[in-house]
């Protein structure tokens, strides 16, 4: 593979995460405007965004098999057509049913693109470099989560209709579409060139189960925590601005942490540093929940920094449980993480209703403790060291 081809594929991976980050995180910015557009209360409107998450979940799950049937380049180009149709549907329709369908299609497109992006990085890079590259790729999710809410605020403040925000997000996919030209993708399944000797199917091992549970608990814990921090802070008497600043501080330090750890991870055994980071994140979250108001900004800043590498390290370790990175295995762990996203309000909503926001934060803290236990247990069964050693020879 030529270096320019590798660079193009890497940029497609970066932009695939930016696309999903933009679609997921911009929701809160435009929800009120969309509710006004359809003359509905915001609480009713939030339910329709479940179609976006459902689309992401279904596409990540199905793409483990689709990748072996439909070439990656074809998927990305067809996704561009679907993106245009979905954005056109948002612009031209006043029907809530068509809005929900367009959101579902956007979810499908971003889920397929993100699973392809993750797979490309696991194919292009080996060992510790794979972990640092995946982490840098994941930082584009956070970066888009910072940039596109600002774009949305800029457009909405000038009374420009909300659907133009989605047209702007579509420009990210336009860049992906352009990059597919003159670019060779790894072939999979029936499209791959098979050697004379059939490849032996590798068993995943129990380590993959530990990582799948860790992925689900981590995402559910993280989103359950950050979703209820503003309500918890307001309950302590903090202003709305100060409560919002806690969330901004978390994501800002999370992004800086990703950049820092994309360099740091190269020098450590991934399972060991993951266990340390999961343990530190669990302690820091507990200190945030039980600490004084004066210390809360410091605890959430350090929590964001030290938890930033956890999810990507889980995916990287998963890809290293087999000698050859398996798209089904990577997509299985991604699917578990996405299930965590889907369950966020299903799990935390009733807890808040019965026991208040602090109980939801303590539940999230318990989920982080489960992540720590899973990562610690993985140390006894992980195959990443033997596969890294054999790749080095």
From Swiss-Prot:
List locations, semicolon-separated: Cell inner membrane
- According to its UniProt entry, this protein's organism is Salmonella arizonae (strain ATCC BAA-731 / CDC346-86 / RSK2980)
| Designated name of the protein | Protein TsgA
PROSITE patterns assigned: MFS
A molecular function annotated in GO for this UniProt entry is:
transmembrane transporter activity
Q: How does it sit in the membrane?
A: Multi-pass membrane protein
* Annotated keywords: Cell inner membrane, Cell membrane, Membrane, Transmembrane, Transmembrane helix
Q: Which Pfam family, an example, fits this chain?
A: MFS_1
